[in-house]
Regions:
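Alpha-helical interaction segments
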Residues: 7-8, 110
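Flexible, processing/modification-adjacent segments and terminal tails
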Residues: 81-137
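Hydrophobic alpha-helical context, especially transmembrane and signal-peptide helices
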Residues: 4-5, 107
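Short intrinsically disordered, low-complexity coil segments enriched in acidic
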Residues: 1-4, 137
Length: 137
């Protein structure tokens, strides 16, 4: 591991501490022009996201005004009611973005995929740099 990466990992609590935990939850206030442009204004305005630490998964709750939640993993995303009943799901969600432009609206499962993927990445940094296959040069 490079000295700089080692320093950054230690500044984030260290690998030993990180490995003692399986998940992390964060309360969020999310805004910006993108959500309205994509037809999903306010869906994630105030939410709690929980992400797996290491294993790639995430969940936002509430998702919209009726206390639904999302379940994100790389090859599946679902929208569930508060009791866990699947209301809508998308298998291989990344492929559903083929041909999209900046103006293309997103479906709710696409929003759940985008938000889950982004938050899992953000909240697992800098530890993602330690994953097998990552070049530290």
């Amino acid at each position: 591991m490079l000295d700089t990466l080692r320093h950054v990992i230690e500044a984030h609590g260290g690998l030993e501490n990180w490995n003692q935990h399986k998940a992390l939850s964060v309360d969020l206030v999310v805004g910006g022009m993108l959500w309205g442009l994509k037809g999903q204004f306010g869906k994630l305005e105030r939410t709690t996201v929980t992400v797996g630490l290491g294993k790639e998964w995430a969940s936002h709750q509430p998702f919209g005004p009726d206390n639904r939640r999302t379940r994100f993993s790389p090859d599946r995303v679902a929208i569930e009611d508060a009791q866990g009943k699947v209301l809508e799901e998308l298998i291989e969600p990344r492929a559903s973005f083929a041909g999209h432009t900046l103006e293309t609206p997103r479906t709710e499962p696409q929003l759940a995929y985008f938000a889950g993927y982004a938050m899992w990445t953000y909240l697992n940094l800098p530890f993602l740099a330690l994953h097998e296959g990552v070049d530290h040069r």
